[in-house]
Curated annotation (Swiss-Prot):
One Pfam family named in its UniProt record: Frtz
InterPro entries for this protein: Frtz, WD40/YVTN_repeat-like_dom_sf
Protein name per UniProt: WD repeat-containing and planar cell polarity effector protein fritz homolog
Residue ranges with Polar residues bias: 642-660
Basic and acidic residues: bias regions: 701-712
Organism of origin: Rattus norvegicus
Keyword list, A-Z: Cell membrane, Cell projection, Cilium, Cilium biogenesis/degradation, Cytoplasm, Cytoskeleton, Membrane, Repeat, WD repeat
Repeat (WD) residue spans along the chain: 305-343, 344-383
Record flagged with keyword Cell inner membrane: no
The encoding gene: Wdpcp
GO molecular function, one term: phosphatidylinositol binding
Length: 726
């Protein structure tokens, strides 16, 4: 079984942490001034210390000048006890900045999971109009602050720009940057305590300030409130001297999250908590576009939920939206397929964080629990490094604290695209954790050396195949987009197909093979022509291998339908000779006739007919035609469970209705010109099957029955439900 192996590193010197000496996967810092403990209480503490030092994990912190790391960490822990952290931002993989409500700016320097330097900057303390900061934006050129009680924004501009590549300069204090402070009035409630949030685009020339909607009866001091005052989302621009409000809008529903697009810097993405006509909870994924410094809503996608949304997150490519609900359900909406997946978490999903690679997502609760899902919402077990291998569905952090401390923030340690682009092949295995009133820490994912520390989609599928969890691997492959991840999709598909072709063919594995190849041949949306041209030949090779695999297990009907789509004469001749050996004379005659037809067509055209070039658009007619299954058995189960196991999660997929943009492709050479030939083929097809109902698998792996009447162009009762090879 696949599971995540982790280590927990808490940056704390407090003795209130309850970490046993046998917890070899949990580390903290120890103070030299601590009294020695008895050997009976901590019998293995010395062995754990030797283990930590052998891995270059410091057991005690040094206090040398000028850093004085031990004293700085104690000061940071005291600050977290008395002030609220309003911003946690990773400038790079090694630099983290924390801003507290009192104006204290803390910079952390990391080396792996360990602290190297802590710089506490109090330059802004006492210089602001309020010590109740709501949110902040930190860049190399300026800082923007919003306040809870003041209807103003603070703009702090630096005369000297910090060098993004110089780590030492990044840890310098603000006083060395010669900054200038200015304040700007903004619309909205003036005498109300409101959480005003901030977001900035990747080009750093636009920003938004937003807050939750207020009720209409909250304006007793003004008889009529203007539309500008009723707005809850502001578009901000930068001038020579500071900020200006370019546009203001009022969202239709209460926003849960607002941010700029990473690929579209002038589009604002919002997630709003809405209700349907029947008062059912929903989530609206909206896109606002900035046109001539005005915000306009250009798109709204409504996602049905089981209960009210409390958290949300998007993947790095912004084509998947994950929503956590009050009933512990997790909803994942895939934009490129137009489907919705559902899973039930073992905790309250108050926090959601998606890995930068898009392979896994983490769901956390305020009670200090953590659960891992893959991008298809299959749960992945997790455990801390220990002597025994006992992975569980959730990871509990509260048991390490003698006091009640809730998990309030978690984030993968990776630089945002706003500041620098992630390097290709860069390892991302650290999850930053912040607990209310402390401590801080990281969760280190030990990914191993075979995958070079990577945690991508291909790496996840390799691990699933290694553990023979084919169902989970196929689900991840189905969630991938061939148009944007073509090479990764092909590697993943070939890995799954190769694994299945090495094993004995069963109805379950046959369905898994069809679902894997169906991600290319039967996508939910037609693939781009460039994608089809790039991968049709290598994927077609695996289709031929599947054909011979079907013949090896005497699956003549499926092999015949596959050969029809490939359109190669040698495949029909293989069926012909094998059918003769098995005594299937009717099938042998049909296959021979098909081979002769291909010969005639190739002679007339002057080239060998290799199959239709644009038959991918006909895959909705079905995939692998089980109307030709033997009597007394259905080759497809209701689900696609992995071999020897059943899926532990529930996936609900919904495809919104909409007009199809598939082109209708006429199939040639399917209708015989003479009525006598049609009757002969009807009799021969009847020898292969007597079923008129086709059971097919759609692109999402859901079983469906096709009761559509056969076209008059079909050959007798032999329903041609094809792969649609390109």
């Amino acid at each position: 079984m696949s599971f995540c192996l982790t280590e927990l590193h808490l940056w704390s010197l407090k003795s209130t942490l309850h970490i046993a000496d046998r917890d070899i996967g949990v580390y903290q810092y120890y103070d030299k001034k601590d009294l020695p403990v008895s050997a009976a209480e901590h019998g293995n503490l010395e062995e754990k210390q030797r283990l930590a030092e052998s891995r270059d994990y410091p057991w005690t912190l040094k206090n040398r000048r000028p850093e004085k790391l031990r004293d700085s960490l104690k000061e940071l822990e005291e600050l977290m006890q008395n002030s609220q952290c309003v911003l946690c931002q990773w400038k790079s993989k090694h630099i983290c900045q924390l801003l507290f409500g009192s104006g204290v700016l803390v910079s952390l320097s990391l080396s792996g999971p360990q602290l190297e330097k802590v710089v506490i900057d109090r330059s802004l303390v006492g210089k602001l109009i309020s010590d109740t900061i709501s949110d902040a934006l930190l860049t190399d050129s300026f800082i923007i602050l919003s306040f809870l009680a003041q209807n103003k924004l603070c703009f702090i501009q630096f005369a000297k720009k910090m060098d993004s590549l110089d780590v030492n300069k990044r840890l310098e204090k603000l006083s060395a940057l010669d900054y200038k402070i200015s304040y700007h009035d903004i619309p909205g409630p003036a005498t109300r305590t409101v959480d005003r949030h901030l977001a900035i685009n990747s080009t750093q020339d636009l920003a938004v300030c937003w807050w939750p909607l207020l009720s209409d009866d909250a304006w007793p001091w003004t008889p009529i409130a203007s539309e500008k005052d009723r707005a809850n989302m502001l578009l901000l621009g930068f001038t020579q001297g500071g900020l200006e409000v370019l546009s203001s809008v009022r969202t239709e529903w209460n926003p849960l999250d607002v941010h700029f697009g990473t690929r579209q810097p002038y589009q604002v993405f919002t997630v709003e908590c809405s209700f349907s006509v029947d008062q059912e909870p929903m989530a609206d994924s909206c896109i606002y576009e900035s046109v001539r410094n005005k915000l306009h809503c250009v798109s709204v996608t409504r996602i049905p939920l089981r209960s009210k949304a409390i958290s949300c997150c998007k993947n790095s490519t912004e084509d998947k939206l994950i929503v956590g609900c009050e009933d512990s359900s997790v909803i994942l909406y895939e934009a490129h397929r137009g489907v919705t997946l559902l899973a039930q978490a073992e905790l309250m999903p108050s926090l959601i964080s998606c890995h930068p690679s898009g392979a896994i997502l983490l769901v956390g609760s305020n009670q200090g629990e953590l659960q891992v899902f893959d991008i298809a919402l299959s749960p992945i077990n997790i455990q801390l490094l220990a002597e025994d291998c006992l992975p569980k569905e959730t990871l509990q952090f509260n048991k390490f604290f003698d006091f009640s401390s809730s998990l309030v923030h978690m984030q993968w340690i990776a630089p945002p695209i706003v500041f620098q682009k992630p390097k290709r092949g860069e390892i991302c295995d650290l999850l930053f954790l912040r607990f209310n009133r402390g401590p801080l820490g990281v969760l280190l994912f030990k990914l191993g050396v075979l995958r070079r520390g990577q945690l991508g989609l291909v790496d996840l599928i390799f691990q699933y195949i290694h553990c023979d969890e084919v169902y989970e691997a196929v689900s991840v492959l189905s969630s991938m987009n061939w148009d944007t991840l073509g090479q990764q999709c092909f590697i993943s598909m070939s890995t799954i197909v190769n694994h299945l072709l090495r094993q004995r063919l069963t109805p379950e594995r046959e369905a898994q093979l069809e679902a894997s190849l169906g991600t290319f041949y039967a996508p939910a949306r037609p693939l781009l022509d460039t994608t089809v041209l790039a991968y049709r030949d290598p994927v077609g090779t695996y289709a031929r291998r599947l054909f011979h695999h079907l013949l090896r297990y005497q699956r003549f009907e499926k092999a015949f339908l596959l050969a029809v789509d490939i359109g190669a004469r040698d495949l029909f001749m293989d069926i012909h000779y094998l059918a003769l050996d098995m005594g299937e004379l009717a099938l042998a005659e049909v296959a021979r006739r098909r081979a002769d037809d291909i010969d005639v067509e190739s002679v007339c055209s002057g080239v060998e007919l290799l199959g239709p070039l644009d038959r991918r658009d006909m895959l909705n007619e079905g995939f692998a035609g089980s109307a030709l299954t033997p009597e007394g058995g259905n080759p497809f189960p209701d689900l696609l469970p992995s071999s020897g196991s059943t899926p532990k999660h529930t996936i609900q997929q919904k495809i919104p209705n909409g007009p199809s943009n598939r082109r209708a492709i006429e199939r040639k050479n399917e209708v015989m010109e003479e009525t006598e030939e049609e009757e002969e083929e009807e009799e021969e097809a009847a020898a292969c099957t007597d079923s008129s109902v086709a059971t097919t698998w759609d692109a999402e792996g859901e079983l469906r029955e096709d009761h559509r009447r056969q076209d008059t162009e079909d050959v007798g009762s032999l329903r041609m439900v094809h792969f649609g090879l390109v």
